[in-house]
Amino acid sequence: NVITLGMRGENDTAIMQHATLEENIQLIRNVLKTQNQLIREIINPDVRQVPRQIVFFSETEEFFYGSKETPGLIGDPELDGVTLMLSDNNHGSTRTLPSPEMRSHPGGYGMYYHMDMHGGPHSFEWVGATYLPKVWEEMTAAYEYGVREIWVTNIGDIGTQEFGLSYFLDLAYDIDAWGGQDAAITTQYTAQWVRRNFGAAFAPANLPRIEGIITDYTRLLARKKHEKMGENTYHPTHYGEAEEVLQ
């Protein structure tokens, strides 16, 4: 078990939306002190022996880094031994990764990665739209930058997300096998996944067609999710956009 520290506001917002950056940082610092003290009193006097994490989502990331005028929580003693969970941009692209100077942090780093998101300005939910080469690109880069302690993905509902979730977990479990040298490894993974899940129900000659459907479908959704698609997304006659998509 890993205890999550910190605090967020209602509906995934900053706690004090109208306060200054310094006031928000001080509030989180006080929260961390209280939480660590409770852990010492109730679980273990040596708080460093208790697995802990704190997740810096998009609305709280600046509390960690601070600004030129206001020091953030980075390097704060209350975070010693705590896994620092960085976050993507809610759409599968990592926001920040640890610099060489940051990678010696006791507790290491983790990543909170979205395959499903409910929130503004647009939600994308319930439809498995994860493009494996994108996951490969972002998470292997995160691994190379030292993000290796905890990987979490938000998938909303498991149904329809099985394909992307399977790769994310297999990559986390054995990055040597599924990290590869480039994103082409995801083609091999797709073939294996299709064979395992559809091989008993379809003739071998049909499996490559299933692979193609899954790959093309998720590739198109990686460009534009259903919820954001509109009549002007692709031009029907100019620039070859419609023809390229329909090929």
Task: Describe the role of every protein-language-model region.
Residues 85-93, 98-246:
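Structured mid-domain segments that build the active-site/substrate or prosthetic-cofactor binding neighborhood
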